[in-house]
Every structure is written in C-alpha cells, then in structure tokens.
Amino acid sequence: MSWQAYVDDQLVGTGHVIGAAIIGHDGNVWASKNLSLKAGEGAKIVNGFKDSASVLSGGIFVDGQKYLTIKADDKSIYGKKGAGGVVLVKTGQSVLIGHYNETIQPGQATTVVEKLADYLRENGY
C-alpha cells in the first residue's frame, strides 16, 4: 500500500480525522490530504518528539495553526485548539498527523492515528 493510500483510506477515509499527513523523520511530507504543512513545520514537529518540553511550553504548529500541547513524549504529541485538535504519532521511520474538528470526538481521532502507527511499527516502519 502506498503512503498516500494510508492517508486516504486508513486516516481520512475513516471519517475520524478531516485531514492527515505522513512525514519522514527529516520533516519531508510523504503523503497528505486536506492538510498542508508550512515551511519548517515538519522539522519542528519531528524535533518536538526529541524535546517535548519545547512543544509543551510553546505549542505545536500544524498547517499554519498553533495548537496548545496537551500531551507530548517521544511517541506521541496531542494538540488542542478550540473543539478541534491534532494527533501526531511517531513510528520508526515516519510521523503520522491527524487533524480533527469539533464534529469528531478527540478519542476517535486518537484511536485511528495510534492504530495505524502501531500497524506500521509492527511492519518495520
């Protein structure tokens, strides 16, 4: 399955995120739908997994929007803005990003992104 197919089918296609992307550990976008990282955001996202204190204090930027970080460690970062938010999960080679709005329960978005990340980890990605 292509990276774009993972984004289209396993993330956005579930209806539990409205936008998604998969980026490499270098910050470059591998695939995306309804989400466009601005210049430098990918690298800052990847760095956030190494330096959780910086994203906990300064928030996380995705698609030009700043999100209040509510959880950050070396595996996942959760951000909130109003009733929407973002879920970012790191695997061995990539970072999955899911964006949800007020019509989606945060837990639903988190489950979809974390589940795909677990699958990719189990398969060496």
From Swiss-Prot:
One of its GO terms (molecular function) is actin monomer binding. Keywords: Acetylation, Actin-binding, Cytoplasm, Cytoskeleton. It holds the Pfam family Profilin. SUPFAM superfamilies: Profilin (actin-binding protein). The modification N-acetylserine is found at S2. Its main location: cytoplasm. One of its GO terms (cellular component) is cell cortex. InterPro entries: PFN (IPR048278), PFN_euk (IPR005455), PFN_sf (IPR036140), Profilin_CS (IPR027310). It is found in: Cytoplasm, Cytoskeleton. PANTHER family: PROFILIN. Occurs in many kinds of cells as a complex with monomeric actin in a 1:1 ratio. Belongs to the profilin family. Binds to actin and affects the structure of the cytoskeleton. At high concentrations, profilin prevents the polymerization of actin, whereas it enhances it at low concentrations. By binding to PIP2, it inhibits the formation of IP3 and DG. This is Profilin-A. The gene is PROA.
